[in-house]
Amino acid sequence: PGSTAGMELSLLRSFEPPDAAVLEDAELFAGKVEGTASGLLGLLGIAADALRSREHLLLSQILSQAWASGKGLDLAAIIGAIQEPPFEKVGVIELETFYPKKDRSDLAVAVNALLASPAAAGWARGEALDVARLLRTTEGKPRVSIISIAHLSDAQRMFFVTLLLDEVLSWMRRQSGTSSLRALLYMDEIFGYFPPTAAPPSKRPMLTLLKQARAFGLGIVLATQNPIDLDYKGLSNC
């Protein structure tokens, strides 16, 4: 992602709605919305609390409403929705009281700066993030896909890893249960993505995968130089 080396992967082409299996599971759907909103705000340098930040709550409601109606959003559409949201209230509070238009314009400008940045052009190029295509060729043959994020900034890495794990989770939900190994997800240098105390956007989908993946034939291998950096809830599922 964000590089011309190897096979390019698009990060920002579009935020497509999740599969039916995720849409029908309230917990998974809420988690996907939260992770996407947190990752995008992280790219903007906004450390947003999912329960208290008005930026996070506004963006989450925009994504949730669009995805629930089956619509995907690109960054341009998100900017438009921030400026003129397709709803009048956030919770029970009037939109203009909760997040005045002038303040929303500041957020829209920040997202637009991300869209206009030279790096964004690289993120928009390449194939869409499709786990099925990463695991198998168009002829159906298994393959190994190695994704390099060493060239990305910390915020960009977190954003991409969160998107990738959510896509793996969606792909997993489409599979039938099996006791055989169907696929393997290996992640090196897990430090910072699954910490014992903090809750970065990548932690939620990773914990869900560690709890449920084996039932769908998905194996997970995490590598770190210091196991104490991993949340014990994940280690208990090994």
Predicted feature locations:
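P-loop NTPase motor domains
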Residues: 1-211, 215
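Conserved ATP-driven motor cores of ASCE-family P-loop NTPases powering translocation/secretion/packaging/pilus
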Residues: 208-237
